[in-house]
Structure formats: C-alpha cells, structure tokens
C-alpha cells in the first residue's frame, strides 16, 4: 500500500509540508543534510527501527528531519546550522574566480614570474568572456588590472635595457603577455583613459563597465541640449546602423538650418548634412545630380560662414570634444579650431562628379550638360584652396593644402591655354583679381607640390602633359628627361603613359618626326593601349574589372584619340620608310616597325583591284605609293584630306609642316632613286619640281653627302654624283637571277641522273667504290628544295 495512506498523516502535517516545500526552493542544503536524505535508501530493518523511534510516516516521511515538529532537539538544529554553507550566485562565484586570478597575477608579477602571469591572464580572459556571454559585463577591476600590468611591463622593459637577466622562456611569455595586454587596452581604450584621468570613478570594483557607462550617460543627460544638437546627436548615433531612412535625416537637418542658429551650430549642421548625403549615395554607382548640387550649395554656404567668421576655423588639426555641443578651447589668437576637413569634402564631391561622368554615355547631350558643372566644382576647389591657405601656418608642410592644390591641377592640366584662362577668370572674380597667365598658374602649382614627396611626381607629369598639349615640346622634353620616372611608383603608370604619348604628339607637331616615331612606337604597337592610357579595359568582360582598375579610368573628355595616335604614327613611318626603301640599304638593319610598314605596302601591291582610299590607313598607303614615285603633291593632297587632323588646335600649321616634310622626303627619295642614272642634277630644276627654295635644296643635299647617304658634291647650281661602289637595284636583280639560274641548272642535272650528281672523269673508279655511291645516293635524292625561288 502507498505510504500516502499510512497512519500518521493529518491536515496539520499537510500544511507544514507546503511551507517546507516552498522553503526548499529558496535554500540549498549542505552536504550533511544530503547524508540525512540518504536514509531513504537504507534497508528494511533500519526503516522499521526508525518507525519505532517515532520518525514520521506517510508524506512526512520524505521531508527533512530538521524541519518537522518534535523532530530532534535544540542540539540537532544547532548542528544543522553549523553544517550549512553560505550560498552564492553564479555572478558572485565568477567574480571570486576573477579576483583569485588577479591575486595570483599580482603576486607573480612582483617576482617577474611571467609564465604564471601569462597563464593566469589567459584564464582571466576566458572568465571575462563567460561574464559577457551571461550578460554580467566586464567588471571595473579588470581595467585597473590592465593599468597595473601596463605599468609593470613598462618598468620591466626599462630594466631589461640595462641588464638582460630574463631567460628565454620567460622572455617569450613576457613578450606574448605584452602584446595581449596592449590589445586589451586598445579594446577598452575609453575606460582605460578615464581610469588614468579619474581613478576615483573605479572605486566600486564589482560594478560592470556597461552600467558605469550608463551612469555616466545619465549624468551627462542632466545637461540640457538645444534642439539642434539634440537632433544632431540622434542622427550621429544612428550612423552605420541598418534600416535608417537617410532621406528623412537629410530633411530633418535641412529643417534645422535657420538664420537664428549660431555659427557653431551651422558649422556642425553643414558637416553632418554633407556627410549624410554622401552616405546615402554610398551604395549607388554615383551620386544623384540633384543631391550633388545640393551638397555643392551647402559646401559653398559652409565656406561663406568660415570666411566671415573670425572666431571659428575648420581644420584637420582641430580639437575633438566629448560632446557635440561643447565648443573647442580657443587658441592664443582667440580662434576656436573645429575638427573637420574642407579638403575631404571637396575631394568627395569631385570624386562623385567624376563617377557621374564615367557612368554617362559620352556621346549624349546628358554628358555635355553634366560637363558644364566642372566650372562650378573648379570654382569650389579654388575657394577651398584660398580658405586653407588663410588658416594654415606652414603652407609647405600642410597635407590638406597639397591635396586641394593637386585637385586643382587635375582639372586644368589637359586643357589648352584659352580654356584655362577662362576658368581662372571665372574662379577668381569673386575672390580677388588674378593676373597670372595659364603657364604661370601651372608652374606655380607644380612648384608648390615639389616639396610634397607624395604628389611631386604626379604634379610633374601633369606639367609635362600641359606643355606638350600647348605646343612647348622642348620644355616638356626637358622636364621629362630630368625627372627620372623610372624610379617612380607603379601608381603613376597611367599618368606616365599619357604624358609620354602627348609628348610624342607634340614632337610630331613641332616637326621632330623621328623622335615622335620612337616615342609612339611602343604604345601604338601594344595590344593594351586603352588600358595603359586609362581609357578602358581590354578584357572581354569589363564587369570583372577590379575597383582599382575602375578608379584608374578617366572621363571621356580627357581621353586621347587612339585613331589620331595611330594616324600620327603611320605618317611618321611614311616619312621615314619611303626614303629608306629607296636608298637600297641593308634591310636587316631596319627596325621592325619599318618592316611592318613595308609589309602594308606589299600587301597593297598584291591586290588586283584597289578602289579610292576610304579609311585613314588607305589614305596613308596611297600617299606612300605617290611619294615613292616622287609625286609629293599627290601625297600631300591625300594626307591633308584626312579630317582627323582638325582635332589639333593648330591644324593649319600642322598641315604646313607636313607639306614641307613631304617636299624634303620626296626630294631625298628622288635622289636615292635616280643617283645611279644621272651623273649630275640641276639644283634649280629640283627646286622647281619639289617647290623648295634653292637654299633649302642645297642644304638637304649637303646633309645627305655628310651622312654618306650619297657620293657626290655640290658644285654651283649642280650636284655631281661620283662613281658609287654600291650596286644599283638592277645589278642586284641580275645577280639574284644568275644565282637562281645556276641553282636550277644543278637541280636539272641531278634529276636527269636519277638523283646522282654529275661525276668528273677523274672520279671514275672501279667497282669497289659502288657500295659507297649506293650509300650516298639518298643524300642527293633528298635535297630539300622548298626554299628555292624561281
């Protein structure tokens, strides 16, 4: 029968049972009480003897003996109280373990036992992680320990400099501990600095850092904030969080801007407003045009406030305050320097403008309309430069000033002088009148950046590009040769290639044909010209381009026309190769580029039907054929009909230069062709044929004689050719024909003798040599004749 129905159970024992069960949920019994619970598992004899001793039965049987009425005496209850332990929560136990580890650390660090200290510090770190996982937080005494360890480590390092007594294993443990303590200090840097400043705030060691921070915030919130700074604080705290409506924040900040706000409030508002707008477009290809123009307007308003204010300055060297509504301390001049960067805001605005151009169709009217905003951004850059110059003490060492100067240079270096002059007049009309010429502007900006190690080479490349674009080839060449760009960083590759190509184009415009050909040779023959000039990708999948490759791309209006580049290169090849072909020089000594041009001519000659020239290449090939015949006038007409020359700003002068070069090279080609036919030629006749002055003809002929291109002398109005040891073209063809006839005759003899060569009579031998002939016949029969020419 169940014990519930055993006699001895009554209502009084039931009520006592409920009270005792509730008390058991609140108290944890000692080990002695657990021994008493084990009486239940005794055998039957002991249970029967317990019943005789008056022990309870029924439901009361399962209750603790010490809680029942009449069970035991005062001595029993006293013994139970003595055996009962103090109960601690999980948090208290964890704190005790931490304090025990800290005590071990403090003891062993005094004896420089760093192995034990490291072991206990790692153990303490695990306990800290457990505390954070259970939402107990990091106690304040952990920060005190970090400060104490930092001091001990510093002292030990100083002692070790004098006498190195630390063992190898101790040194390894010490260095490991040093790095981990440094890492932990960095993680709790705010509290660490606060402890160093006000140690009294950490007297309550068991308090967690989270609750301590909340208490600090509660004390700070007792100070009332103005509506502007209250909203600013809310917006700043929400930055970086998900699901935040940026447009709503922009609307809120725009509504806070009013004439009643102080200068400090307006400066803070504009900084936050500009940053929020930039953040809103961070996940887009480029910033919306309306938002970009709003940021440009607000940045101009911010500069207006900064220029007018004599109390506040915005600089990267400014002071940061703990609260956004607290103004920085004034300096000796009474000026409060606020932490911020006008240069960074201008850089970001300019980058968004560039990305907008890169993501717009360059052949559409949208691109042209967007490009009109470049004047506005340039005016803003000039304003920013003027403001930074007014607040910076050491201009040469200011990085923010160097950055904005480089930005200004990037917007004008590729333009002709007329556009630069217009931009400068528009930018300075509201600041102060400027009397500098475009070349003086470029030179002053470049000279300023030469003191900056980061931007010096970049500025010099921009300067070279500018001089090359505006026709000052000698100046650009001098700068390029003196710069030693071969020691520069690879980040300058695009700028270097652009400057080099523009230098080659400038050499062509100035009449330095051979130099232009050498400069442009490698770039034109490269398969990666677009990529090397920052004008596109050569891969089949542009979407796979990296971020760095996309950043190197330039807007379309800064591109160098690759068709113009190829046209200039082929024209240079024409002017160099046609006289070289007529001179009958050793073809092995010719450059590979000239051979490729000759192959184009040979390919054209093999065509059965050739129509009128259509492409740029066709015009140049037809002009080459005309020049070979000495018809320089036809060659000039073909070249001048190419419309791409109009891309040069001074195309009239360019065509005049090309005409003169064609006349000179036509004269040289004529001399090379007919020097073996004529014994002398009239200089006046040559002058009339090629449209040159007699003085110029005499000068060209004299140069050819000095370079040993021809043998002769200029005598009065004639050039007299002497006997030329060099074979003529007809003689060379006759010699080649004779060699081939001999080869054909020998081959026919071998064929008629069934593969045997014709034997001389002196070689007739008896039958003993027949075996040797038999062995050698395959050598004659297998002659390779694939290379024979007929």
From Swiss-Prot:
Its subcellular locations are:
Cytoplasm
Q: Which UniProt keywords apply?
A: Cytoplasm, Initiation factor, Protein biosynthesis
Tell me which PROSITE patterns the record gives: PCI
Report the leader peptide range: none
Cellular compartments per GO CC: cytoplasmic stress granule; eukaryotic 43S preinitiation complex; eukaryotic 48S preinitiation complex; eukaryotic translation initiation factor 3 complex, eIF3e; eukaryotic translation initiation factor 3 complex, eIF3m; multi-eIF complex
Q: What is its main location?
A: cytoplasm
Biological process (GO) annotations? formation of cytoplasmic translation initiation complex
What spans are recorded as compositionally biased (Polar residues)? 751-770
Q: Which residues form the PCI domain?
A: 556-728
Could you state a single Gene Ontology molecular function term?
translation initiation factor binding
**InterPro entries xref list:** EIF3C, EIF3C_N_dom, PCI_dom
Name the residue ranges with Acidic residues bias: 14-53
Outline the segment boundaries, as ranges, of region: Disordered. Answer: 1-62, 748-790
Function as written in the Swiss-Prot or TrEMBL entry: Component of the eukaryotic translation initiation factor 3 (eIF-3) complex, which is involved in protein synthesis of a specialized repertoire of mRNAs and, together with other initiation factors, stimulates binding of mRNA and methionyl-tRNAi to the 40S ribosome. The eIF-3 complex specifically targets and initiates translation of a subset of mRNAs involved in cell proliferation.
Q: Which family does it belong to?
A: Belongs to the eIF-3 subunit C family.
Quaternary structure annotation from Swiss-Prot or TrEMBL: Component of the eukaryotic translation initiation factor 3 (eIF-3) complex.
Q: What is this protein called?
A: Eukaryotic translation initiation factor 3 subunit C
The source organism is Lodderomyces elongisporus (strain ATCC 11503 / CBS 2605 / JCM 1781 / NBRC 1676 / NRRL YB-4239)
Q: Which gene encodes it?
A: NIP1
